[in-house]
């Protein structure tokens, strides 16, 4: 009987919606629900069904409470005598409305797994901002700190004009505006963290003390795993600087910050370093370090907690840092060495794996111990394809270094699954071995010819110009990276014992690969350029570059 009711509902929507595409999507969704109900209904009693409905309703309401989001129903319920009629209309159109909202999202779901570029920039130029910066310069000049090591004045210990000046630049429209250019104001909160702020004066040299950290690639904080929330450090150049450059390793950008230039970066995740140019500054380099916590509005207090954690760590690290600027005795010299050693190891972890990725993979592995023996393999074998597809779809505002790190990390896990299972079920099959060696050999040769950056969307993401390759293997095989990878994958599948144990693994790899290849073909962002000189070389070289 319920099938007839569903059919009547879908037919009535065809007239009511007056939108064929939306109606087709709604009908397909209802058909899917009916199919699932046919499978699950026999295993549920009436009591179980009522419990499930109650859990769903309570969970929905709890989600609204946690996120602080009002429901549409709450805006009219009990407000007028006719509100039940509006409730019926609301319920009738609820599913197509949800689908329509999904289609018209301001930001695609694909952006959730994209390696976004979170570095933000601005420049303070108006009279009020310049006056505030000059107040800071005058303060430092009057204090006249030693030039052979860094000097620090914490915001909370400042007084008078200099504190007012610091507060001004911390809250000025230009400073806050650079965050709103990156984060939607209707979705995020941006709040200052005064307890972390300071006036910083650079030293003229560094000599195996904790100052050396600044000249070593590093991340500032340890809370990179805390999801969806950011603590920003903003480096604001107070005076002229033509000597010291600030570089962001993964974003591949950098330069001298001078006279009101400001750059903000994720305190816990962004690898950065400073270096000296041959030119010398006339005066000491003065910088204001400002900090902000940025979190989704729906996180509420949970977002603020990241700011609290960062403040605690910054205070602890600050005390250690000050004690090791001029280390005395073996203990403090060892502590200074330990600061540098730990900084380098954390940098290596973030650059080549990413603590987020490591923790995520570890969590999936642990979950797999309770869910299914194959869960970890299924959850991590196709992640890199999803990242390819999502990144190619979004393309704007991508941190190329982080993207490349992430896909290589998960691709390595995927290949490890293939190799481990191949060895576990190994039986001698010369054709299988030959296909793997030839296929991945061809794919590797194509990667070497293109280079790693071009292989991983370097051209599509605008970080490099295309290198039109006409030599081996592009002069022998069309699309050698795709062809080679597919041959290698099918080589795994060729071995009977591997195929019997994991009949769907390689077909799923091939399906994901083909999905992305079709995406590139359909959304060919360079198709207007093929007749302008690249022609066949470009098709064989710069495009279709992903290795499985």
Which residues make up each language-model segment?
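Membrane-anchoring alpha-helices and their flanking helix-loop junctions
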Residues: 1-71, 85-110, 318, 324-474, ...
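Conserved hydrophobic/aromatic beta-strand scaffold that supports enzyme active sites
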Residues: 121, 216, 233-237, 262-264, ...
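Glycine- and acidic-residue-rich phosphate-binding/metal-coordinating active-site segment common to enzymes
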Residues: 28, 206, 226-262
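Non-heme Fe(II)/2-oxoglutarate
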Residues: 110-191, 397-399
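Catalytic core of Fe(II)/2-oxoglutarate
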Residues: 243-341
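Conserved double-stranded beta-helix
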Residues: 156-241
